[in-house]
Every structure is written in structure tokens, then in C-alpha cells.
Amino acid sequence: MKDLLKFLKAQTKTEEFDAIKIALASPDMIRSWSFGEVKKPETINYRTFKPERDGLFCARIFGPVKDYECLCGKYKRLKHRGVICEKCGVEVTQTKVRRERMGHIELASPTAHIWFLKSLPSRIGLLLDMPLRDIERVLYFESYVVIEGGMTNLERNQILTEEQYLDALEEFGDEFDAKMGAEAIQALLKNMDLEQECEQLRQELNETNSETKRKKLTKRIKLLEAFVLSGNKPEWMILTVLPVLPPDLRPLVPLDGGRFATSDLNDLYRRVINRNNRLKRLLDLAAPDIIVRNEKRMLQEAVDALLDNGRRGRAITGSNKRPLKSLADMIKGKQGRFRQNLLGKRVDYSGRSVITVGPYLRLHQCGLPKKMALELFKPFIYGKLELRGLATTIKAAKKMVEREEAVVWDILDEVIREHPVLLNRAPTLHRLGIQAFEPVLIEGKAIQLHPLVCAAYNADFDGDQMAVHVPLTLEAQLEARALMMSTNNILSPANGEPIIVPSQDVVLGLYYMTRDCVNAKGEGMVLSGPKEAERIYRAGLASLHARVKVRITEYEKDANDEFVGKTSIIDTTVGRAILWMIVPKGLPYSIVNQALGKKAISKMLNTCYRILGLKPTVIFADQTMYTGFAYAARSGVSVGIDDMVIPAKKTEIISEAEAEVAEIQEQFQSGLVTAGERYNKVIDIWAAANDRVSKAMMDNLQTETVTNRDGVEEQQVSFNSIYMMADSGARGSAAQIRQLAGMRGLMAKPDGSIIETPITANFREGLNVLQYFISTHGARKGLADTALKTANSGYLTRRLVDVAQDLVVTEDDCGTHEGILMTPVIEGGDVKEPLRDRVLGRVTAEDIIKPGTADILVTRNTLLDEQWCDLLELNSVDSVKVRSVVGCETDFGVCAHCYGRDLARGHIINKGEAIGVIAAQSIGEPGTQLTMRTFHIGGAASRSAAESSIQVKNKGSIKLSNAKSVVNSAGKLVVTSRNTELKLIDEFGRTKESYKVPYGAVMGKGDGEQVAGGETVANWDPHTMPVITEVSGFIRFTDMIDGQTITRQTDELTGLSSLVVLDSAERTAGGKDLRPALKIIDANGNDVLIPGTDMPAQYFLPGKAIVQLEDGIQISAGDALARIPQESSGTKDITGGLPRVADLFEARRPKEPAILAEITGIISFGKETKGKRRLVITPLDGSEPYEEMIPKWRQLNVFEGERVERGDVVSDGPEAPHDILRLRGVHAVTRYITNEVQDVYRLQGVKINDKHIEVIVRQMLRKATIDSTGSSDFLEGEQVEYSRVKIANRDLEANGKVAALFSRDLLGITKASLATESFISAASFQETTRVLTEAAVAGKRDELRGLKENVIVGRLIPAGTGYAYHQDRMRRRAAGELPAAPQVTAEDASASLAELLNAGLGGSDND
């Protein structure tokens, strides 16, 4: 009995294992799994419904159909367990063995396994070094293959057609051996000597020079080595025995009406068995060769269909014309085993219902309908009822609950107390989509949700539904309370800002409460404290907005963490004094002494959390909510039509704009501007007009002028309802108010181009039919986009999670000195992100020195919290080197110091935190907010007037970087380089502003000159790009042939003529290869050289360029030779939003990437070919020069004789991340990807911490390619896990051997996920077949390191609370203490248990 109990305990424990290995199954192994051979295609008898003997459901092979009962009924009941009935041959045991016992089919002829044949690259083909087509022709009996050449001139593996075979037979007789079909391939594979082949290939590899051959050889060597090392035999890729799946995994269920529902696998197996039996019979009869051959081919096809239907030829379809689901289909895809049953399971103890508001709840509570609670907590209630003796049996308890007796409700109350439940709203995009609450029982049928957690769930109350789950075990309840409770999730893991922030009504209420008003009732009173303020407000003696003096006591923490009070009289308003009553001790009064908008409230809660900690913040947040709701109700703010005040200036602004447009139209008709320029200018005019109208409107709404008590006029901020809602951040924005009371403005077509007639009306005036019709375009586009976006965003999140899922914090400090240099993000005159936001919560990589001194301000390895950041700001530090996960030296994980602060908790990150998944969720969750294209606010085109000048905001000195310029005839500098940057440096040498200066801009100030604030330093024409000459001389046209490469356009109105270069598409055949160009020559007709080089000045003209000069005209340096009309920004290919983020993470090469210098050296140009120039870089140390061919149409940024650094831009374009990694290193590529991704998110106003993006970049960089092997056993050109190389090199260096040299690879997230070491994780992601095939051939072991693998095998994940469990397991295993198995078998135990139960129920065994 003791043994039995011991065993039952052990039953609940799973078998301990450390790794999963996948390999090819040998025929003997398949036979050893099997419990008998399936010989007949029959399934069950249609009359008795009993399984047929030897059929696909045979009870003798697979086990009994009923528990402990043989098929013929001779042996029933438990006492006969283990007996094999002599009549029907069935073992008496549990019926669940039908889920695990397999059978087999002995194939009459070998068949190839289609996965190893057709999954590219074909493993069989690679092993035999034969093309797949040839192998297929052999397998499907179209040609012969020579197996032994013998003494003949036939090679082994040679393919012979029928005729060739017959000729050879006549010539050589039986000297040689040639066969067809799978047995031929099997023989070839059997005869291979893998080790010898391997040696031979290695020799070849050392001798060969050709790159392609090397690649092919390495591939074969890798495959052969995999076979040798894994112990797989090549001939096992050909099946001679086919395993049969246990019958309960391919069920056959009788439906009513005599029909059966069956799994497709049964049909597929039936075909195989039928064909196999027929083939056996034909072989016994010694049938003619051609018939046997046909039958063998059909058998091969049947086995193919069973393993992977549709991979070869047409898929076999069932009766309903649908392709049958084969074994491969069972495991792959969203509906396959991995994603449907292993990674996502449905759970019991859950319910769902509509949500509604619970404004009276506390933050940690939710309202749960009584009906739901009763159903969810049933087992607990039954238990309690029995425990109290209110019900004698479970059955009685059940009856009581069904009758809903009064006592049941009391018990329910007890059960629910302190038992948290989980609330989840789909889609769960980040971890805050599931939180724990304490249930409060309510009447009704809707779940009540606390308003402050809506932001985290992204929930609203327009009919959203939520699911409730009950954590059952004690551990689960503990985790729910300690980790998942809504009160523990105040900060967002994406950016560390509070996510429990009031919104909408609450914000409006607090804003209304803290506004001040001139001449309000009770102005000028002096009050003794907040209590009195509330009293006089309630009594109606003073208005909420009255400006008064109040005595306030503020508390501050001293050195001993005691609160010290300080009382003073402060100018404030009645409302602010009342609000002060709920602010916790320890915060300054200045925090409420302002009109509180949404940002201010968020900041207030953040400050509270940082100063006072979690508990006061939660209480404070709750209080603000109650107060906000109360005062929003009192304020009576609502929207009426008169709140939308249309500015008086509107008509005048619009008529001015119309006049300007008419003028441009005239210029166009007289040929001064091209169609494209006209369109752009018109759009610019309207965009500017729109801005002016909205400015006039906002000025009008914002303030009204009132005379105060002293008779002085002052600007009073308006109490207009619409304005208050927008200003407080409760609802609406300036852009929306503009459409209500300004003008709707320009609209976009669905393709993103902007319609040039704007909608001048607004919604208050109403739209006419045409205007309404124009606006429907954009509005519909918005809806269609949203639908597409959601799916795309979800897929991006899935790829991110998959690539980062196994990244966990595994140690405290890796001790690296590597780091990333952080500087503020400056775009134009604005600091987009100050330094403090970028370094807050990171760990310093080196000491920070106080600027201008040698004093250490912050030591290395300091976590920069708010106080440290204040210190940095105080000393105006403008660059800090911080630790980053990309440089972390930890193997298979990250250290806490390189990660820094846990954003959701505010302290340094704990070991075991799953930072990979957090990063993926933080990047993926806002994905739905990113637009697919970057313009549209309700369809209105948001496009500012194009920039045409640079105006600095502060005073300072100018610094130009990578600038080249010439002085034009007017003595002004003209920029002739393409990625010039202009920085404004203040007197301390800090960068204040930074601008991009385009090619062709005229500079008002030169490098190093001083400028005053507001001065314009550069200007240019935004709509055309000039081609500027760098030398003076005369023009000579080359290849400019009228009608072939150029056409002359004469304007009818003005008679001005200009030349337009034709696009290559528009040219005649003769003009295709011509390169129109302008050459500059001197008076004698000789080429003028570009200064500082020996290149002639020749300017190639791209298509569409307009030349307004004639051949032979004299020009001077800095003049424009031609104009290239720029397309508007609407159609310029800036992939915005989500697709851009996906491109960056997939590390896709841009279409025409920038060309970067491969080495540092001096530029020169070699011999040109027809369409390309030869760029030569000669290194300074005299080593081998580097050559590259560059197409002539690429604009070059460098001149002959110029010195370039490795990684400098030679020719413009978007940079390819792979090039950046290769030439500038890991940190540069990290910086590039981080900044580019952040740009997209910043545009949408989404804040994400850089850390998260760095985590993903680390995962993209986790592979390395071996350049030279050293003493290691890697192959050259092999791609290996970066950690593996590091560990191997450490060992080699420790033993004084030569380390392997490698270069880091940048993989896109999909590639990186598929290249992970764990084949289980990769197979559950994408391309399941390919991953499993590769893994099986290599005999891979999965060490179950990541999260996904552990979820799939059903273990605790090695992160979070499971981290300790896994660490402990590793320790125990290292110490060699693994739990001993009990001495009872599963069968015995469950049987004895059943016997006990029967005895207890008074049943007797002897009837």
C-alpha cells in the first residue's frame, strides 16, 4: 500500500530529462516500437463496429477498445489485467494504450522518404552528389542507375535510359549492375564509405580555388560529417518498414445515420496497405516487370502522400475534393501540433463577459458577476460545503449549488476572499494584457473594470469582452498576487513611464479643478488651509477657480527618512488647495499649483513613485481618479455648436491663397515652372494657408482679454469647452479642432498622393457634395489600412518574440568595458530626445569626467538613476558611455549590468528576467498604432510646407561636417556634397542644433563663423535639384542628340526653349547606350580639370533633367547647369511606419544602397568600361589597392586624390546595415538600427526605451562566420553561434593554441529565428518540414535552453519563477542526485487504486 501511494505521488512528477534528440529511425527501431504488423486495409466492421483483426484499428495490435475488457468478452474486470485472451488475442489492460501503441507495415519494396528527397536542398541528392531530377527519374522508374560498374566503362551513379541499359546489357552482359527504383538508391547509399568520402572531399577542398566549388564541397562535408557523428546511416532515408500511428490519434467516429467521420490519415494508410498487398501478390505471381514496376511506383506515391501530401505532383484529394491532411500537415502551420496544442492550449476554469466601468473600485479590485463566480469557484465551494458538514457528499453539495441556497452565497464570499483572478483582454499584445485582481461580487452579468487599467489593456467600454481565469494552485495564487496584481504594474515595461494614468473625464476634472480665473467669486481671500478652502467652496462663498492665498504645510523627507513639515502661505486657487488634500506627504505643493493636463498628471504620479514608492502611489492614483470624476461632473463641460468659433480672418487668408495659386497657374501657362513644380508650389501654398487658419483659430480660442480688479487688461485662458478638452489632453487635438472650426485642408488620395484642391470648409460650416466626396477617399483608406495593419503588426510581434525568446538575464556582471556612446538626439533646432532620457536606468561603462576638469563625476558601473541624471544635467555633460546588451560578454544570456534598470520596477534587473520577450512585446505592441504610410489624420494630409532654408534658433558658431563647396559668381558658398551636416556649437562646445544641408544650397555663413539666433544660414529651392559646376569655362554638349537622348521643349506663350533629357525608357534604340553629359572646356577647347584631381569636369545628366543653356555658353563656378525637378514628398519613396520597422529588423538591403569605402586610403579612378567607372582605393601603408566597379549614373561623393576612412560614404543612398556592420563594427550597426527604428516610433509619439531594440539587435548578431579555423574544429566559411566561437576560442587560448578568426553576421529576425540552436523552437516557428529534416539528418540534440522549447515539452520556463527551479535542477544534476524511481509500475498502481476504490464502493469481483 505504501508503495502504491509513493507511486501515485511519482505519477504526478514528469520524467526528468535534460535534452531531446532527433534522428533517423532505423527499420529495426521502427519494428521495436511496433506491437504488430498491420496487414489489412480494413478499419472496423460496419455492423458490429468492432475493429477488424490485423486491420488499421486491430485490438490485438493496438490494445482493447474498452478498459480492462478483451474484444470477445471472455475476460472482463480488473483481476484479469495483463492476461492475453487466447480467443481474440487482445491483452486486457486500459484502453488508453491505444493512444501510445504503434504498429508497422512491412513494405514489399523500399520507398524513399519524401522529406529527405524533396525538402531543399535534397539530402539524398547532396549525399550521392546527384541532381534531384536524376534521382527522381530513378525513383519513379523512368531510368536506371549504375550501382557497380565492374570492369565496364560505366561509372557508378551514372544514369541510363531504357535504351542505353539494353545496349549495355547486350555489350557487357552481367559484368555490371544497374537498377531502378528506391532499391537502387538504397544500394547506392549502403555502399557509401562516409569517412573515406569525407577525407577525399577535404583534400579536394584544400586543392580547389573556385568559390562555388568550395561552397558545394563544404556543404557536402558538413552533411557527411553530420551522418558520421550522429550515427545515422544514409540508407535509413529509404524506408523498408513504415510505422503506423496509434489509432486513437487518427480516430474513426460513427456519426448518426450510419456514416463515419474519419481522420484523413486512415485513407492514406489504406492506400498504402492496398498497394503494398497488391505488390506482394504480384511478386509472388512473378508478374511481368512492367506491371511490378508500375505497382512499385504507385506504392512510392502512396507513401509520399502519407508523409507529406502535395509535396510531389498533385495532392491526393478525398471525396470532397479537398487535399487530404498528411502527417506533415498535422505538425506544421497555425493549426498544426506545435502552434495549436503545444504552444497554445485552452484552459478550464475560465469565463468571459462584456466589461463595464467600475468607478468606485479600488485599483486592485474588479467586479465579478455572482453567476460567473459561482461557476468558476465550484470545486472550492463543494469542498467548503463538505468541510463545514453542510453537505454529506459531493453530489449533495452539487445539488445545493444548483438550487443556489442562501448558505452557498456565504460560502462563495469566503472562498473568493483573498483569491485573486486573472483578467485578460484579447489581443494580448504585451504582458500588461493579463493582470490579477481581487474579485468583488456584483449583481448583473458584466465584469466591472477599474478605469485606470484601461490604458494597459487598451480597453474601452463600447462592447469589449474580457476573459476571467482562476489560478488554482497555491503557487499560482502567490504569483498572481505578488507579480501580476494590477497594483504591481504601475510602470510600463516599454519605457518606464507610469501606465496607470488618468485619461479622459478624470483629466478634464482635475484640469478644471486646477484652472484659475480672473475676477472669480471670492478672489483675494486668505484661507487658513485646504480644509477651509473646501468649506467655503461647498458653502458657495467662492468659486473653484478663485485666486486666493492659502496656508499650506509641505512635508519633505530628511536624512533619517522622517517627514519634516514646512508651512507657508502660497498664492493659489481654491481648487488646487482642495486637490492638495489627497496628495501624499512628501511631495512639494508646486506639483499641484499649476493647471494639470495629462502630461503633468503623469509626471506627478511618476515623481510620487520615485520619491515615495509603490503603496502611496497606488492610493494617490485611486484618489485622483475619484476626485477627477467628481469634479468633471460638477464642471458641466459639454460640447455645443457655438463652442466651435470660426476665426474672422479665415475668408481673407483663403482668398489670399487663391490669388497666389492663380498666379502660379499663370506662371505655369507661360512656361516659367514645370507641371511638377506647379503642383508642389500649390500644395505648399495651401499647407501654409491651412497652418495660418489653424493658428488664427487657436489664438482665437485660446485666450480672451479681461480687465482684472486693478483695472489692468490681462490675457485670460479661455474656458471654451472644446479648447479645455484639447488643452488638458482629455480628448481631441489641435488637428481635430482645426477640422471643426478652421478648414479641413488638403486631403490624400488612397495612394498617398495629395489632392491639390483643398477642402476650405470645416465641419461647422458643412461640406458641399464635392468636398464630401473628396474626403471619403481618405476616410476609407484609413479603415482599410487599420485592418491590414493589425495582421502585419501581429506577425512582426510573433517574429520578434521568436527571435528573442531565449534571452534571459543569467548573471550579475560580465565585467566588460565595452559600451555605447550616448548623445542627445538633435534634429534641426529641436532636441528630440535629451541625454537624460537616453541614459536613465543604464549602467556607466567608464568613469564620467566633469567637463573642463579631471574630476570623476560618476564612477564606472554606476546605475544612473534620477539623482545621477540631475547631476549630469547640472554639469552639462553631453555624452556618456553606457553598457549595452549588444556588447555583453555573457554566454547564452545577458548580465544585469549590461541591461541596467528593470523599467517596470525601477531597480536593477533581477536574474531570470525574460528580457527578450519583454523587448519583443514592447516593440510589437505599439505596432498597431504605427500607420502603414506616414500621412493621414482622418484622411487629412499632414504635410508641412517644404523646407527651403535653415534658420538657427540659438546663437553660436557654425560647424560644417563632410562639406565640399565652391564659391559662385556672387561670392557666396554653394554646397556640392551630398550629406553635409551643419551643427550649431555653443560657447561650451556642445552641439545645440543639427541640420542636413542639401546639395546646391547657398550658404549665408561659412564654417566656423559666428551667427546670432534667428539668422538664416542657408537657403535652396526645395522643388528642384540643381547640377552645379565646380569650375568655370565653356559648355560642350556630349551625347545630347535631339530626338534620341534629349527633346527640345519650346513654350508657346514665352517662346523660351529648354532641353529635357529623356528617360532611358523613352529613348529610341539608338539612344539607349548614349550618356548625355555636359563637359566644361576652356577657351582653347581643352578639358578643364576639377581642382585637386586629374578628372575632367563632366556632368552626367539623369533622365527628366532640364537644361536651359546652349552649347558653347560661358559659365562660372557655382552656377547651375541643369535642374532636376524633385517629386513631391508625397510620392518620394519613404517607407514609413510598420513596413519600415519590419525592413530594419529583417535587415533587408535597400534597393540602391550607399556604396561605402572598404578600406582607408586615397581615391583614384581606373580604366572606365561602358557603363561603369572603376574606383580604386590605395591604402596608405602600401598594401594591395582595393578596386570596385561603380555604375556611372551613381553620383559620387569623393574626388580623385581625396582620403577616405573605412566605412565612409563613396556614393549616396540608404545605407545597408550589413555594410555598416562589416566596415564600422557592431556598435555602429546597433546605433543605426536603434536610431532608424526610434525615428519611426517617435513620429507617432510612441516612447520605447533603446534597450529593447538593442536586445533584438543582439539576437540578430548571434551568428558568426568562421574566416580562418586556427586550431579549432570549425570549417572555414561555416556559420556558428557566436557564443560557441567565443567559448571555443577561450579554451584554445587557455591551452596556448591558435584561436579561430571570425566575422559577425547580421541576420534578419526570421532568418535568426530559424538559425537558432534549438530545433524545437525553430520548427514551431516556420518551415517546420525543413527544420526537422535538417535536424534529423544531423542527429541534433536540443538542450532546451530557451523558453519556447520548455513550454513545448511542458516544463516550467527557465525564466521568472521557473529560473530558480532550473538552477536548482542543474545543481542537483551536477551533484548527481536525481530522484529515484519508485518500485511499482504504472499499470500496477492504477489497477490497485481502482481495486481499492471498487472495494470501498462495496463492489465484488466474483460475479
Swiss-Prot record:
Residues the record lists as binding Mg(2+): D460, D462, D464
EC number, as in UniProt: 2.7.7.6
Cofactor(s) needed by this chain: Mg(2+); Zn(2+)
Alphabetically ordered keywords of this record: DNA-directed RNA polymerase, Magnesium, Metal-binding, Nucleotidyltransferase, Transcription, Transferase, Zinc
Free-text comment on the cofactor: Binds 1 Mg(2+) ion per subunit. Binds 2 Zn(2+) ions per subunit.
Catalytic activity from the UniProt record: RNA(n) + a ribonucleoside 5'-triphosphate = RNA(n+1) + diphosphate
Similarity comment: Belongs to the RNA polymerase beta' chain family.
Subunit structure: The RNAP catalytic core consists of 2 alpha, 1 beta, 1 beta' and 1 omega subunit. When a sigma factor is associated with the core the holoenzyme is formed, which can initiate transcription.
Protein name: DNA-directed RNA polymerase subunit beta'
